[in-house]
Amino acid sequence: TLYKNREIFNFIDKLKEKNLIYEKDGATWFAATNAGLKADKVLIKSTGEPTYRLPDMAYHKDKFDRGYDIMIDVFGADHMDAYPDVLSAVSELGYDSSKVNVLIHQFVTILKDGSPIKMSTRKANFVTLEELIDEVGPDVVRYFFIMRGTNTHLNFDLDLAKNQSDENPVFYLQYAHARVSNIIKRASELKINIDKAADLSLLNTDVELNLINKMNLFPDCIKRTHDTKEPQNISTYLHDLAMYFHKFYAKNKVISDDKSLTASRLILTKALQIVLNNGLTVLGI
């Protein structure tokens, strides 16, 4: 759309009005040094083809003009030097570039049979995201990418992603969720209702208290994730929560002959199901 309505070239005109555009060697340059940056940058090549900086600049202007009050840009590490030019250009036109949050992601290495798959865009040898999703499924791909912070290199192990064992963090979490759901389903089959008046003081073992305390941290985890723009906080939290549940499950029966304790542990299990569902929903899984 920015090309069809010529907004990218209108952006050049706006920069010209600010004396931030000049021609050299047949190319159109952004006078970035006039805006306080270290080097001027080409916006339109001598061939007439725009560099990627120009549509990025026009796109941000368009977002500001449409009233967006916060923008989150996700760049690869190879664009580390590009985004300051984009922010500088829109700032020079009077837009508040502080409303743009830039996240720089490190690269991803795809591993198969323990070895990295060699990729080269020049040789058209690469794995697309679509191919990755076809190989292991969308939930696994999303979770593996979310697990790592933006500053951490990701080794995407295809064998691990397809492994149906506790070594696979997605399987580990899904297994906990399945166990919880099966307990709730079994209680329903036995006509045991969730009793909100259950005596929760009966939940006093270390594994139960650890699980309760961890669940209580969920709102803080969500807020911290929002504030830091680091969703790996949620995946780490959910993995730890699943770990606490597996420890609880290994030592305790939820449904037993002790009706009072059963009622209390069903409340605990139902609460855990809600937290797991909410966490997975936030992650889009």
Which residues make up each language-model segment?
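Non-catalytic interaction-recognition regions
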Residues: 1-285
